UniProtKB/Swiss-Prot annotation:
Protein name: GTPase Era
GO cellular component, one term: plasma membrane
Ranges for region G1: 19-26
Gene Ontology biological process terms, A to Z: ribosomal small subunit assembly
Organism, as annotated: Haemophilus ducreyi (strain 35000HP / ATCC 700724)
UniProt subcellular location: Cytoplasm; Cell inner membrane
NCBIfam families for the chain: era, PRK00089.1, small_GTP
Subunit structure: Monomer.
């Protein structure tokens, strides 16, 4: 009698990465995935979309939701939408990774924690940037104090930048996955389109090369993304700002700043897409776009 070979069990689950702005959530996701999916910058509020990162190892598939940083300020339409996206991300997941920064604890951290009190999924507290803590003896009392604030499933000091204890965090994630079929093919690392990733790369370079000069009233719209007959991606990016002065900041003296942004963005795109890229960038003033929900919808900041 011929024996029927049973397929090995597979496991899959959704993990939300939450925290106030600029604590290293995007850096952590990129470190876990081994490549850049979510954009990073020294500035807060760099992540605006719920980017999904996918890690498949043998029978395990972890699907990561990288949220915008939850924050208190909600005066602008874009901030309200970012808070809404982050809050909805924690509603239906198998595990929540709450990222905080070293021994700092702010009102925004407290606000995020209060939102997590209604979450059904277990919460792992990841204390990031521990390599930057000057007084190392402050860490243990800080962990003790935080453990009294909430019933965390685990508390783990990490350094997303250096990779410290990230492998332990991944083991915790693996234990949280449920038995079930994988949602994505194993070669997928994100569900976002190349067009979307191109806009994110340009936006990262904007954040990186404008320093503290440019506020967050800047976005990128990809007007053309096509593969030409020579096998090169032709990408046209439109950078939207709110004021004429911001346009001058992006362009820079004799166009040098936008040239640098374009060179760096093209290099990242060619690495990510494994293909030659011809990139052209323009800057346009569109006053009030960050306060206009219709404009935000057309730019992909909210679902139709």
């Amino acid at each position: 009698m011929r024996m029927i070979e049973q397929a090995p069990k597979t496991y899959c689950g959704f993990i939300a990465i939450v925290g106030r702005p600029n604590v290293g959530k995007s850096t952590l996701l990129n470190k876990i995935l081994g490549q850049k999916i979510s954009i990073t910058s020294r500035k807060a509020q760099t992540t605006r979309h719920r980017i999904v990162g996918i890690q498949t190892e043998e029978q395990y598939q972890a699907i990561y939701v990288d949220t915008p940083g939850l924050h208190i300020e909600e005066k602008r339409a874009i901030n309200r939408l970012m808070n809404r996206a982050a809050s909805s991300a924690i509603g239906d997941v198998d595990l929540i990774i709450f990222v905080v920064e070293g021994t700092k604890w702010t009102d925004d951290d407290e606000m995020v924690l209060n939102k997590l009190r209604t979450a059904k999924a277990p919460v792992v507290l990841a204390i990031n940037k521990v390599d930057n803590i000057k007084e190392k003896d402050e860490l243990l009392p800080h962990i003790t104090a935080l453990s009294q604030k909430f019933d965390f499933a685990e508390i783990l000091p990490i350094s997303a930048q250096r990779g410290k204890n990230v492998h332990i965090l991944q083991k915790i994630v693996r234990k949280s996955l449920r038995e079930g079929v994988h949602h994505f093919p194993e070669e997928y690392v994100t569900d976002r389109s190349q067009r979307f990733m191109a806009s994110e790369i340009i936006r990262e370079k904007l954040m990186r090369f404008t320093g503290e000069e440019l506020p967050y009233s800047v976005t990128v719209e990809i007007e053309q993304f096509k593969l030409n007959e020579r096998g090169t991606y032709e990408i046209n990016g439109l950078i939207l700002v709110e004021r004429e002065g911001q346009k001058k900041m992006v362009i820079g003296a004799k166009g040098q700043k936008i040239k640098t942004i374009g060179i760096e963005a093209r290099a990242d795109m060619e690495r990510l897409f494994d293909n030659k890229v011809h990139l052209e960038l323009w800057v346009k003033v569109k006053a009030g776009w960050a306060d206009d929900e219709r404009a935000l919808r057309s730019l992909g900041y909210m679902d139709e």
